[in-house]
Amino acid sequence: MTHLRYLAQQFLLLLLTFVAAKPLFLLFNGGAAHPYAFGDVISVMWHGLPLDVATTGYAVIPYYLLLCIGIWVKLPLKCLNIYYRVVNTLLAVLLALVFVADTVLYSVWEFKLDGTVFNYICQPGGALQSVSPLYAAGVVAAFAITAAALWVVYDRFRPKKTLPRERRRVASSLLMLLCGGLLFLGIRGGVGRSTAKVGMVYYSTHQFLHHAPVNPAFSLPTTPSAGQAHPFDSD
C-alpha cells in the first residue's frame, strides 16, 4: 500500500512539526516571568495533541486528495514533484509565519495567536511602534530560517519515483476512504458531541502553561474571546 504509506508519512511529519514547535515556544517565552519544569514540557506536548491532530488533519488534505487520485491514475513523477513542492512551499511559509508570529507576539500580548492579529494587517505600524529595527530584522530572519528548514525537511519526504497504480484499486480506495473518515474524526476532535476547540487543551492554572498547548494554526481563525479563555472555563 504505497499510497497509504505516503499518507501516513505526511501525517506524522506534519504532526511532529506541531508537537516540536511547543518546546521552542516554551524555550523562547519561558524564564523568570514564566517558569516551567521539564515535566511541564511533556505535559504541554501531551495536552496539545488533540488540536495538533485536528490541525494536521486539515494540513494533510492536499496530499490525501492527490494520493486518492493516484490509486486510479498513474501520475508522472514531474507532476508529483511540482504538486508536492507547491504544497510543501505553501505549508512551510504559512507554518513558519504562524509559529514565529505566535512565539514573538506572546511575549507582548500574553496570549496565543488568534483573530486579533487581523486587526493589524491594515495598520501594521501600530503593532511595530515599540519594536526596534534590529529586533524586526531578527524576527524576519527567524521566519526565513524556519520556513527554509521546514521546506527542506518536507521536500526530503516527497515521492522520488512515480507512484504505481494499486493492483486492488477498489480495496485500496475503500481503505483510503476509511482513512478519510479517520482524518475527519481527528479534525472534528473525536466522536463526542463536542467538536475540536481551543479550550479542549487547557489543563493548568498557570496562565503560561494554560496557553502553551494551544496550536496557533488552529486558534488563528478564532475570535479573541475564544483565544483568551480563562483557566478551566472551556466547558
Identify what each model region corresponds to.
Residues 2-229:
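Transmembrane and membrane-interface helices of multi-pass
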Residues 235:
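Catalytic domains that recognize anionic headgroups
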